[in-house]
Regions:
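Residues forming the flavin
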Residues: 1-267
Length: 267
């Protein structure tokens, strides 16, 4: 197996750099299941229904030059932060700055990156919650003294328990929420720290320094959505996700073809 937790739970022949095409695997296979001369072929099968689970594509923030991702090493996207926080990640779960390996004493999360703007007017629905989770995780890993600030337009908690999670983050973990949208990030070239510029609720321009910034990137339709829609004869909505009805959220515009997960809408 290439991956221990692969799905489906099956073995494959990995013709990587260590395979010399000796063919010994054919002779030792007890069920004669290996045919090294097998060629790809097209098959037609009849099914009663089709379920589309294409998932989503994460927004690429490199095009937003004012936020510095790709230029400033300590500006990371949420997926990169998740890898740093993962016990199986490159830092074994220890959250460190990419520039110098130092544990940050202050982290800012910027919300709605690639969502609720002129290009992508829809809400990605998950960013508020995962940013709050990541901020709490920073407190747990780095200590309660680390400064965690979330720059957010408004709280979008799409669940009864989610509102309580926000309250817990604010009251118990002392996560700070700033209701604004960041206009620019600049780097201090000596320290690698980041200067975050934003407007206060009173309209005053303010600047605050953080040692690390996390961009809460939104969700976009998968790249294969249009190709699949054309081949299956289904419609997409104005944002490029699968078109459904509010009262039948699993049904596409073609009978017998259903959709699940984030392909129907960001979730």
């Amino acid at each position: 197996k290439i991956a221990a937790r692969a799905t489906p739970d099956a073995f494959i022949i990995d013709k990587g750099p260590y395979c010399d095409d000796c063919g010994e695997c054919v002779s030792v296979c007890p069920t004669d299941a290996i045919n090294l001369k097998e060629q790809p072929r097209m098959e037609t099968i009849e099914v009663g229904a089709i379920i589309l689970a294409l998932g989503f594509k994460v927004y690429d923030s490199d095009g937003l030059e004012e936020l510095g991702h790709g230029r400033y090493p300590n500006v990371v996207e949420a997926m990169q932060y998740e890898r740093l926080a993962s016990r199986s990640g490159p830092t074994e779960g220890m959250i460190t700055r990419p520039s110098d390996g130092k544990q940050p004493s202050s982290i800012a999360w910027l919300q709605c990156i690639g969502s609720r703007d002129q290009d992508n007017p829809f809400c990605s629905s998950i960013c508020c919650m995962y940013a709050t989770k990541e901020a709490i995780l920073a407190k747990q890993r780095l200590g309660k003294d680390v400064d965690c600030s979330v720059f957010i337009m408004d709280e979008r908690a799409f669940n009864k328990e989610y509102s309580a999670y926000f309250t817990k983050a604010r009251d118990q973990h002392e996560i700070e929420y700033n209701y604004c949208r960041v206009s620019e990030i600049r780097e201090d070239p000596q320290s690698g720290d980041l200067l975050v510029q934003f407007a206060t609720p009173g309209g005053e321009l303010h600047q605050e320094k953080f040692e690390m910034v996390v961009l809460a990137t939104g969700l976009q339709p998968p790249e294969s959505a249009r190709y699949l829609a054309d081949n299956l004869g289904i419609e997409l909505n104005q944002y490029g996700f699968c078109k459904t009805d509010k009262f039948t959220p699993l049904q596409t515009t073609r009978e017998g073809v259903y959709v699940c997960g984030a392909f129907s809408a960001p979730k």
